[in-house]
Amino acid sequence: MNKIDHRINYILMLDTETANTLSGENGTLDMSNVLVYDLGFAVIDKRGTVYESASYVNRDIFVYERELMQSAYYSNKIPQYVEDIRNGNRKMASYSEIRKAIFEVVEKYNIKVVCAHNSRFDVNAVNITQRYLTKSKYRYFLPYGLEVWDTMKMAQSVIFKQKTYREFCEKNGYLTKNNQCRKTAEVLYRYISGNNEFIESHTGLEDVMIEKEILAYCFRQHKAMEKVLYPAPLPKPIEEEDIYCFEDYLKYL
């Protein structure tokens, strides 16, 4: 095992795929009760170098909530997951085992930051799943004290200000109905990689690998940028020693 360089500010890049994705009355997706069945993460630095990675399938949802799995937005990928588990490309584990693995890697690398693309969704998803599976006995999934970054905020600060990105979106039809450039990881990666044929996998670890490239690209521009979704919280509440407690500090923002 390579020796850990404690001069590096390691980052935990995270991505989730979820079930229980319900359609609202107007056809929009209701993401308020999503449940994580796929969680991938990688330990990276600001250059996008990967030091460790893992791909987990949450047994508690994937196996024990088979009916809910049919509501997954990418339920057509279920056979692929089964094959990946069989050939060792993904590890089946309980949600508590996945959480333990994250706690261990955060401690191992002294990680202070967790990052995702549209991280509000992923942070909410892991917490909703934690509450669902423990009947709210345990409410927060991530280790307490992490700062939460969002590559979507980074891209809006850096990539969206590039004239060439606007031209790229106009040329390829990557504009919203409000004539704004799209900010999906897939479109952003197509732009920074020069591969306009790229198709996002929509599986946890594979998506982490493109999102860390968005992060690295933004840092390479050496521009001022917004990146923090949730800053590191206030000192840990004595009565809640092992949770990521947003409510205790969001009111101070």
Q: Can you name each region flagged by the protein language model?
A:
Residues 63-86, 151-206:
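Active-site-proximal helix-loop-helix substrate-binding element of RNase H-like nuclease domains
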Residues 2-123, 127:
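Conserved non-catalytic scaffold segment of RNase H-like nuclease domains
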Residues 56-59, 141-159:
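A short, structured active-site edge motif that brings together acidic residues
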Residues 120-149:
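Substrate-recognition/cap helix-loop segment adjacent to the acidic, metal-dependent catalytic center
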Residues 21-23, 156, 213:
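Conserved protein kinase catalytic core
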Residues 16-19, 151, 211:
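Ser/Thr-centric signal marking residues that sit
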Residues 110-116, 137-138, 196-202:
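Short helix-to-loop capping/linker segments positioned immediately adjacent to catalytic or ligand/cofactor-binding
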Residues 2-3, 170-180, 191-192, 198, ...:
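Acidic two-metal-ion nuclease catalytic site recognized across multiple nuclease folds
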